[in-house]
A protein has these predicted regions:
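Low-complexity, small/polar and acidic-rich linker and loop segments
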Residues: 2-180, 184, 191-209
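Short, mixed-charge aromatic SLiMs
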Residues: 100, 421-437, 729-744
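Hydrophobic, often aromatic-rich secondary-structure segments at membrane interfaces
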Residues: 282, 286-398, 402-668
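Hydrophobic, well-ordered secondary-structure elements that form the walls
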Residues: 603, 707, 737
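Hydrophobic alpha-helical segments
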Residues: 719-792
């Protein structure tokens, strides 16, 4: 069948469809491949073409039906979004306060809730089957068996049984996650069919890219170009080569299996429905490829697959099958409507919608900005910043800085049916991590499960290598911070569902007004409340609960799960996509501007988030004066306690002030440590980073701190000791080296305590006479004393 004739036939079959040249070539090649396949089975050319034509006609009808449904769905989505009284960009990520005070539904929150639905259920089933530790061990020998069972889970004829029940159970559970991921996307407009022997497609773009050369492609092709009979059946050699090169390009660019180019007006439902599967002949072939170019073990691949599915679903749920097109159209309509008001407020809204940052935020939320400009630059710098986390945050728990999360979570209780004091008591008990099974039932309390610990301290970084990410997460486990945060989030999540169950006998209008506002922001009003409260029952902790997963109405269940997920994120002060976007100015990783922004603003997303989430909630519907006083006073109190714990590590404590100046200094220091002014990120850093004399360090960010100290030391050595000074150039150099080493040494709580109690002053005084006395004078001015004075 001539190519021109085939193209003409395609156009005749779909006269209203405007095909791109690439689509026409792709369809033509597929038709020709299928004809050759039929001929290889013994059919005449005419019979082969007739068979393929019949199949293509059926597929065309199905595609037309899908397109019609998609168009109708997009119309409904646009109507829904137009009816909402908030700017288009606010639907991407809850911006807290201002024009979005009555809404909290967002792509970002839905993404997180959907991912929780998949992974918490999976974790519970793996644990019940007693294979959770086996799966997470990533043992190569056992994973071979797991892959084989995953490959044959629906068709036992695909290979022999391994005879390993644990592998069979794990494959069944992980397979359910893959099936659920496909189903949730199909419900929103995708049409993803089952693929025989489907294995998760989670390829590492950095490994595939290598140095981007032909040699890197040849190395990749050595594995992916063989043992794929089904993928290559009926294709000519040049077509196989074109397919392989296209897949390599898609994988190394990060587009393969992803949401795609968020800058284009593509049909997302159709895009995720397209075949983006690399089928190997056997599970062993897939395992070999995954070990060479995958993101980790099988559990990692399944989690990455679930994450993409959750994000795709959240985007389509909010913006339909053509999300960027609908978003742009909606933004333009709302912008014009705002300007048409001819008021100052309207003009501000219109200008905000017009800002290019909104397109950047769309890229952040949909994931396209996870793909950096230059992967090598991005990866190197992201790993440096990850190392900076360990240098600066090793004592985040023992040093008391993490305690601020207790009152922040307690404030969330106050908005959701509890009281602040009840919240403080709950969160203090939660430090010890009780009711973790209940926490998982309500999808709360496992940063490690959702692999989100490392992202808490990044402006955006998704470029951290797998090995470094694992190392940093292990580091936070060692510090106790991961466990502390999981326990805090779990305690809040369980309390939220308990408050729902406790109030099940009340009607919606009988609830506290603040609580009604919190529920309404997630689309929960009297009808949804009446549906949900009918499912109140005693849970394993002996108290009444309304657990979202138990609610029979799927739509209502989703709203309540979003409500729980959103408030847990608020209590944890997790940076939103909006906050991260603001902090880095909408720049992209791997670009000069993007990397500079990320270095200068590392940890600063906490400051923005504090103002957005915490104070934003207190300005919603009017100024909540009692709430502001509670938040400020409790944060200051935790800042004071944190300062005392920090003193234990640094071998110096704060004396009680004896004058007004001392009290002002103590209260100010406690307020800054507690993040009262939204400076939570700075409060996590060392004292020097908060002092007014170290403005240069504040400007360059924590990674630049050693450079500032090094420059200062070199300058001191160059200038030499001042007049009347007893120091020498050599001693100035030693002091400078000591300072720089302190900047780059991880302040893990145990080593920090040993260092501060046993080492520095004795050595410093030997090398630099008078160092202890001078430091003691500084401490006296700051009203501080040593716990254990150093030897003179």
């Amino acid at each position: 069948m001539a190519t021109d004739a085939c193209i003409a036939a395609i156009r005749a079959a779909a006269p209203t469809r405007q095909f791109t040249p690439d689509e026409l070539v792709s369809i033509t090649e597929e038709v020709q491949r299928q004809v050759r396949e039929q001929m290889a089975l013994g059919k005449t050319p005419r019979a082969a073409k007739a068979t393929v034509a019949t199949a293509m006609q059926a597929e065309a009808k199905a595609a037309a039906a899908r397109a019609k449904w998609s168009a109708y769905n997009d119309i409904l989505k646009m109507a829904d979004r137009e009816a909402e009284n908030r700017p288009a960009y606010a639907m991407l990520s809850d911006t807290g306060g201002g024009t979005t005070r009555n809404y909290a539904t967002s792509v970002e929150n839905s993404h997180k809730a959907l991912l929780g639905d998949l992974l918490y259920r999976q974790q519970a089933e793996l644990k019940a089957a007693k294979v959770d530790k086996r799966v997470l061990s990533r043992d190569p020998v056992w994973e071979n068996k797991l892959a084989a069972e995953l490959d044959r889970r629906e068709d036992p004829t695909r290979g022999p049984s391994t005879g390993d029940k644990s592998a069979e159970d794990a494959a069944r559970i992980l397979g359910k996650t893959l099936d659920a991921s496909r189903a949730m996307q199909n419900r929103q407009g995708a049409f993803i069919g089952k693929v025989e022997g489907y294995m998760p497609q989670a390829w590492d773009m950095w490994k595939a890219r290598g140095d981007g050369s032909e040699a890197a492609y040849a190395k990749w092709k050595e594995i992916f170009g063989k043992n794929r009979d089904k993928d290559f059946a009926g294709l000519l050699p040049q077509q196989i080569e074109a397919k392989l090169r296209g897949q390599w390009q898609a994988i190394k660019s990060g587009v393969f299996g992803s949401i795609g180019d968020a800058g284009g007006h593509y049909d997302l439902g159709a895009r995720v429905s397209q075949s983006r599967t690399i089928n190997f002949n056997t599970a062993a072939d897939w395992v070999a490829a995954n070990r060479a170019y995958g993101i980790g073990g099988i559990a990692d691949a399944v989690s990455a697959h679930a994450d993409r599915a959750a994000r795709n679903t959240a985007v389509m749920e909010m913006f339909g099958n053509k999300p960027k097109q609908l978003f742009d159209a909606l933004r333009e309509k709302k912008m014009n409507a705002a300007h048409a008001l001819n008021t100052e407020a309207g003009n501000k809204i219109g200008d905000a919608l017009k800002a290019s940052r909104n397109s950047s935020l769309f890229g952040d939320v949909t994931g396209i900005h996870d793909i950096p400009g230059d992967h090598r630059i991005s990866t190197i710098n992201a790993n440096v910043r990850a190392l900076s986390q360990m240098i600066h945050l090793g004592s985040i728990l023992a040093g008391g800085q993490a305690l601020i999360h207790i009152p922040l979570n307690a404030m969330a209780h106050r908005l959701t049916g509890g009281s602040f004091l009840e919240g403080m008591a709950t969160q203090l008990r939660g430090v010890f991590g009780k009711d973790q099974d209940m926490a998982h039932a309500v999808h709360a309390g496992s940063d490690a499960l959702l692999q989100s610990t490392i992202r808490r301290f990044h402006s955006d970084d998704g470029s951290v290598g797998q090995r470094m990410a694992g190392f940093v997460n292990s580091f936070y486990k060692a510090t106790g911070f991961s466990g502390f945060m999981d326990n805090q989030k779990g305690a809040l999540g369980v309390a939220l569902t308990h408050y729902l169950g406790r109030a099940a006998g009340k009607t919606f209008d009988q609830l506290d007004p603040r609580w009604q506002t919190s529920l309404t922001r997630y689309g929960i009003e009297a009808p949804e409340w009446d549906v949900a409260r009918a499912f109140a029952q005693k849970a394993s902790d002996g108290r009444m609960h309304v657990i979202p997963a138990d609610i029979a109405d799927a739509g209502v269940a989703r709203k309540f799960q979003n409500y729980v997920t959103g408030h847990v994120a608020q209590g944890a002060n997790e940076p939103t996509a909006w906050a991260r976007n603001v902090v880095v100015g909408g720049t992209r990783a791997g670009t000069p501007a993007g990397e500079i922004a990320r270095y200068l603003t590392q940890f600063k997303s906490f400051a923005v988030t504090m103002m957005q989430r915490q104070f934003g909630s207190l300005l919603r519907g009017g100024v909540d004066v009692p709430g502001i006083m509670l938040l400020a006073s409790s944060a200051m109190g935790m800042g004071f306690i944190g300062g005392q714990l920090h003193g234990l590590l640094t071998n110096q404590h704060q004396n009680m002030p004896t004058d007004a100046e001392g009290w002002v200094k103590l209260l100010t220091d406690s307020a800054v440590r507690g993040g009262v002014f939204g400076l939570l990120g700075d409060a996590m850093l060392r004292d020097g980073m908060r002092s007014g004399s170290d403005v240069a360090k504040q400007l360059v960010g924590p990674v630049g701190e050693p450079l500032v100290d090094l420059i200062g030391a070199l300058n001191n050595v160059r200038q030499g000791p001042g007049e009347g000074s007893r120091t020498t150039r050599g001693q100035e150099a030693i002091e400078g080296v000591h300072k720089v080493l302190g900047d780059i040494t991880p302040n893990f709580w145990a080593t920090s305590a040993v260092y501060n109690y046993l080492f520095p002053y004795m050595v410093a005084n030997t090398l630099h006479p008078g160092a202890v006395q001078r430091h003691q004078e500084v401490m006296r001015k700051n009203n501080q004393s040593w716990y254990i004075p150093p030897s003179p």
